[in-house]
Amino acid sequence: MNIAGLVCYRPGDRSRLIYRIRAWRGRKGESKALTWTDYRDLLVAAHQQLGGPIVLVWDNLSVHKMPPMQEFIDEHADWLTVFHFPTYSPELNPAEGIWSMLKASLTNFAATNMDHLVRTTKRQLKMIQYRASLVDGCLTQTGLIMEPS
């Protein structure tokens, strides 16, 4: 199972977590990892949900820097601006706080199958998603500060 997530902050608004899960089931031709199109679709969904331009600060995952992804970013420069975190700096990424909370919530969990794992993971992420103070804390722990433009 792979998860991609965006932790969204805007001064004066409730913090948001937007995510997608890919459960690998071993089907012929099925990708085990999230592809650049999965990330593209996540960005499009975020743009629709948030209803405004996005300034994205991304880690240096190779799929984030693939030529088709870069083309998508360039084509949507009217609503999408992308910066990258410095290399090897997970401590600056608020999403890492989300993954840490998720992992802690699943510490003693033993899934019976992939569907059970996906359902439980979604339930745990929804619990985080609906508690904006938890999402806010992920930004606070990075030491980064939001400044209104």
Predicted regions and their residues:
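Short functional hotspots at interaction and active-site rims
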Residues: 1-149
